[in-house]
Amino acid sequence: MRLLLTSFQHPSMAQFIGGKRVAYIPDAARSYADAPFVQKEREGLEKQGLELINLPLSHTDLAAVETTLNAVDGVYVAGGETFDLLQVLRSTGSDKVITRRVRQGLPYIGCSAGSVVAGPTIEAVSLMDSPDIAPDLKDYTGLGLTELAVIPHASGSISQFPIETIADTVRTYGERWPLCLLRDGQALWIEDGEVRLLN
């Protein structure tokens, strides 16, 4: 199993995928369609030579999700609202399809929310993202692809996520979950149980 979990992308993404075609899952940012970070995220992948196959889970049936994942070299789960993302994954059943394919060897790249959902829980980011955006989501269990609970943007340099919020997150959830604080520009490369921190 291979994961590249980023706070906001990383120069090693194309190397990690080892191919060209990537299923791009944008659902976490569906309420931010015109936000600059959304376009910047897509451009970051394209600049590394990756071809993006758009895969919006909220209006793609499971058979089409499966077909797309079978035709690409990797899957990229974009950033945005973590709780909304998990709600979409869970309500569509695509969480099970993606988890199965990644466990079978499909490379998984997460960015921010996409990295958080790969872990054991998304509860630990509830001070950063609002659970209220996903009122029907009652279970915060993540995809369970790693035991680490990623906390993105941990340098506190983004106004939306000041260092005080990061510190409160560690105080509130640090004893309950194995937190991994990532700054923008950092990534976790996880392969067959081995974890490497990339700067």
Curated annotation (Swiss-Prot):
Disulfide bonds: none annotated. Keywords: Hydrolase, Protease, Serine protease. GO terms for molecular function: serine-type peptidase activity. One of its GO terms (biological process) is proteolysis. The keyword Iron does not apply. The active site is at S112 (charge relay system), H153 (charge relay system). InterPro entries: Class_I_gatase-like, Peptidase_S51. It is an enzyme of class 3 (hydrolase). Its EC number is 3.4.21.-. Pfam families: Peptidase_S51. Belongs to the peptidase S51 family. This is Uncharacterized peptidase DR_1070.
